[in-house]
Amino acid sequence: MNQQLLKEKVAAAVLEHVPENITLGVGSGSTVLCFIEALKQAKRQFRDIVAASETSSKALEAAGFRVRDLNACDPPDIYVDGADEINDDKIMIKGGGAALTREKIIASAAKEFICIIDESKKVAQLGRFPVAVEVIPMARSYVAREIVKLGAEPRWRQGVVTDNGHWILDVHYLDLTAAERMEARINTIAGVVECGIFAQRRADKVLMSQSDGEIVLW
């Protein structure tokens, strides 16, 4: 089973965990786009929907859903999103699509966070995928120098501007053995908007599609 089919399978499977008539938070990324398509096919109805990226908002609206601002509705009952990496402790690396700040805001506001992945995203140790750090543009060089002091290698993702109007540094070789402390440390650097370590607000449930066709919940 190829990766696209695995994404579609887990996106359909999570519908069993998402009741109608709730406030739903929707993340971003390729697996989430499959989830939006599954919502459309199932003709689900929700009280409100909030989205973590402009891309997801447009996909939801194209599927017939009305997207609300987080300030204009109740906190999400459930937030569904993917991950670039996730470990057994449900700590994630996110931000490959540059939507990490809005993803973390909605995840933090939500009562329950369900992460949907295919088996390629499950790792024994975090860090193979670089950690995205959203920065205010004028602070890029300063933040990069501070990150070097942490023993890591920041690289500017040139040409990418986030939905918030900021830039992204992709941080390689970051020591994530104490991911929660590293998340807090990076977020104390002046000019950092948010980082893509999701340790303080990790997933509550994970649904993973395997190449044998099974869906694993943990």
From Swiss-Prot:
Family: Belongs to the ribose 5-phosphate isomerase family.
Quaternary structure and interacting proteins, as annotated: Homodimer.
Gene Ontology molecular function: ribose-5-phosphate isomerase activity
Record pathway: Carbohydrate degradation; pentose phosphate pathway; D-ribose 5-phosphate from D-ribulose 5-phosphate (non-oxidative stage): step 1/1
Residue positions binding substrate: 28-31, 81-84, 94-97, 121
GO cellular component, one term: cytosol
Job description of the protein: Catalyzes the reversible conversion of ribose-5-phosphate to ribulose 5-phosphate.
Alphabetized UniProt keyword annotations: Isomerase
InterPro entries with a match to the protein in the record: NagB/RpiA_transferase-like (IPR037171), Ribose5P_isomerase_typA_subgr (IPR020672), Ribose5P_isomerase_type_A (IPR004788)
Recorded catalytic activity of this chain's protein: aldehydo-D-ribose 5-phosphate = D-ribulose 5-phosphate
Classification via PANTHER family: RIBOSE-5-PHOSPHATE ISOMERASE
An individual GO BP term: pentose-phosphate shunt, non-oxidative branch
Protein name (Swiss-Prot/TrEMBL): Ribose-5-phosphate isomerase A
Keyword DNA damage belongs to the record: no
Native source species: Dichelobacter nodosus (strain VCS1703A)
EC number: 5.3.1.6
SUPFAM superfamilies xref list: D-ribose-5-phosphate isomerase (RpiA), lid domain, NagB/RpiA/CoA transferase-like
Family annotation (Pfam families): Rib_5-P_isom_A
